[in-house]
Regions:
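Short amphipathic alpha-helix with an adjacent loop that forms part of the alpha/beta core around
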Residues: 31-36
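Hydrophobic alpha-helical hairpins/lids featuring a short glycine-rich hinge
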Residues: 82-126
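Short beta-strand-to-turn element immediately C-terminal to the catalytic PLP-Schiff-base lysine
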Residues: 25, 59-63, 104, 115-117
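Glycine-rich phosphate-binding loop of ATP-grasp-fold ATP-dependent ligases
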Residues: 20-22, 43-70, 100, 123-126
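ATP-grasp fold ATP-binding core
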Residues: 5-12, 37-53, 81-95, 101
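Single conserved hydrophobic/aromatic residue that forms the stacking wall/gate
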Residues: 124-134
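Catalytic core of tubulin tyrosine ligase-like
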Residues: 74-77
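N-terminal, positively charged regions that mediate nucleic acid binding
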Residues: 1-22
Length: 134
């Protein structure tokens, strides 16, 4: 099952798991509606591929001007062959520690695979496999 990040966050809400306040943007006109988020706000491309941050698809906006600018830059962007058609705007969090966990299916071994890293998701997507426990 491939989920966009915002779909996963809707599951958080369903099961009362804390997560930052957010808003979906499907076109730039959506920015005319009240945002109702506290700055800084993270502008996140919604594509089903890793490396969004490195590709410029995740940016932190400190005010409405940056939010508009980053939304214009990211919406419609191509990230590894995936066109960005939806943005997730999310209140930035004060992150003390970051971890990465991924659940997937190893088809060659015919078993489930859980990957963990104490370095956060950027490590995993930066080819530092020696730091990932699976």
């Amino acid at each position: 099952m491939d989920l966009f990040e915002y779909q996963g966050k809707s599951l958080y809400q369903k099961f009362n798991i804390n997560h930052p306040n957010s808003k979906l943007i499907k076109n730039l006109n959506d920015l005319n509606d009240p945002i109702n988020l506290n700055f800084p706000v993270v502008v996140k491309a919604q594509v089903q591929v890793g490396g969004r941050g490195k590709a410029g698809g995740i940016k932190v906006a400190k005010d409405i001007n940056e939010l508009t600018q980053y939304s214009e830059e990211i919406l419609g962007m191509d990230i590894k062959g995936h066109k960005v058609e939806i943005l997730l705007l999310e209140e930035a969090s004060n992150i003390l520690e970051e971890y990465y966990i991924s659940f997937t299916l190893d088809r060659s071994e015919k078993k489930y695979l859980i990957m963990l890293s104490a370095k956060g998701c950027l490590l995993y997507t930066s080819d530092a496999a020696d730091e990932v426990v699976s």
